[in-house]
């Protein structure tokens, strides 16, 4: 015989109404009661009917995720994989599943907003996309609850990693090791890039250092080949930098290859630093100096913002959370090998 909500009610010693409210996350049901009901349901093998719950609450308990990564790494990129895993876990704790939003259902093309409506999602988290694309703006401007990661819209909640602070930590670390000729190889145009460039210039200014415009160059994120070429160009200048900050940890692989081609030792002759704090790069020799982003907190906070907006539309306003980052001091950034002019120190 199939297990029913009545069985859960009897096992918990609660009314059917209370058990139903617990399953549907009503605000007047305590967390302790919800956990008791959910734990009991698992123990006796009861699972609420999703269709019935949708009819009762007018919600699908389904969160859309827009993830359009064009560099080819997709969910193999540890930053995005970790953020999405935390988002998924936080959503599941509050009774929500996730659905990826795209352009197609089979052979049928549609906009992101149309796909959201087709899938009947309660809200959407934009994790990675061209935030300036008309289709993304259409989605953000719709009446659907939306939260964004690492990009801010005036009328939407967002979760930002402290990209300005991250570059400041790297410049501070380089300065403390005697570096004055510091170059920054940044990624392609995005809100993340813009904030990191601001952080670089701001930190250099705080240390009284002039920024050589030729020392701020563009490469592609997660593309070691373009960073390798950027480093070769920088180091072939008459007065090259002594320390180079890269767009991300993967890009430092290209930078290290460039140093090898030029017969430069890292960090004795050239210091390098990455960004993201990918665990695998901590196995490099020398161990990489980098910035670790709190991906778990980013994903969890995005889920909380979105679900609060879904469940409390009249009281949950647009919020912004800036998540702190952490400097991982490795061995790829060393003491500056040459003396610098006092005027530039």
For each predicted feature, which ranges?
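Alpha-helical recognition/docking segments in bacterial nutrient-uptake
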Residues: 58, 62-172, 176, 234-236, ...
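Bacterial carbohydrate/catabolite-sensing allosteric modules
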Residues: 43, 86-94, 141-147, 152-345
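Short gly/ser/thr-rich secondary-structure transition/capping motifs
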Residues: 43-49, 105-109, 128-129, 256
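Structural motif corresponding to alpha-helix initiation and N-cap regions
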Residues: 2, 48-49, 109-110, 132-133, ...
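Residues at alpha-helix caps and immediate loop-helix transition turns in enzyme cores, especially N-
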Residues: 33, 76-79, 135, 193-196, ...
